[in-house]
Amino acid sequence: GVKENTKGNFAIYKLKQPNKVYRSRLWQQADRHSLTKEDYYTTFPNDLYADENNKYKWEKETKVLDKAFDTGLKTDYDLSAEFKSFKPGVYVIEANCKDKFGEDIKAFSYITVFNKNNNEIPEQTADWFYYPKTMAEPGEKVNYILASGYSNVNYLFEFEHQGKLVSSKTELASMKSNE
């Protein structure tokens, strides 16, 4: 494609996520429900009724940023200072502009914001992982975060080399960085 300069704006919204952890679906989602949502949760309090874990369907909770842009003047925007004030959670970035024919163009991007020095998990999920580096050389240390929306969860790590178990350990799930 050919670059076209345009003006528009983008807004960032914090999304309202479920207030509890749901168990992963054990069967396909029903296309029709025989129970009301309330009756279902009374019987199956930890199971998904509909699309509660689908971030693309979560409501917007709060607009946290609204900025104009002009790609004729600037194409990169550093928002690191603004992100420092964001609370951990899932956000959607919505960009709006018009093309050279006056047609509306909308783009969406979903991001997760978290703080490695804070114990607040950004999503209500059974297991949340962050690996800043996906590959390492022998002897090199790798940092990672393994967290859970449940309390007192342990993870089992087993390291193999050429099909043989080299080591095994358990760690408590936490938003603190591990090696």
Model-derived features: positions:
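C-terminal segments of large proteins
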Residues: G1-E179
